[in-house]
Amino acid sequence: PLLGPAKTFINHATVDYETTEYLVAECARMGCAFLNAPFTGSKVAAGNASLVYYAGGDKELIERLQPFLETTATQIMRVPSPLAATILKLTTNLITASTVQALAEGLSINAAHGIPADTYLSAIEPNACASTLVQMKGPSMAKGDYSPHFSLSNMLKDARYMLDLARRAGLKTPGIANTTDQMQKRNDLGEGESDFSILYRQFKQK
């Protein structure tokens, strides 16, 4: 096998609970080091070396790999375990997906009452709900530009993993459950490769 003692396996993919446990167990069985380091940031962020890694693994391993990770990152956040890295990545994506769904609803309500999108977005700017995400997605959603920065199919995948995390904890999460349903509808219409902000189209077509 390619993996074994003196080898290191780094996972950057956003995977589910079960896959994370599998990777931890398999690397332990083969004797190789394992670092789970999913990240937040886009292709542009990677090119600008401004990703943020959630690094879950042995402390000494993270320190050894830090120079490698820093080539594409502004921050390496050490977290308690590989599983914690997965959970943190998924639950931050939960906020991202839910925020865009809420923004789609807000834009649609304003449009229905004759208030222009730019007026609504300007009203958000000084409000506590303002965020980098809203600044990024709001204008493009208003224009109907769904060029992919993070695809609907990928966010839908992550949303299913989020629901699995909630189920394992015995929690009901109606907010992300509804957003998942809306993403599934768009995906079923063949829009999976568009940006996940295409959630707005559920209102634009009515």
Pin down the residues of each PLM region.
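Short, conserved loop/helix-junction motifs that constitute active-site signature segments
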Residues: 1-5
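Helical "substrate-binding/catalytic lid" subdomain
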Residues: 84-206
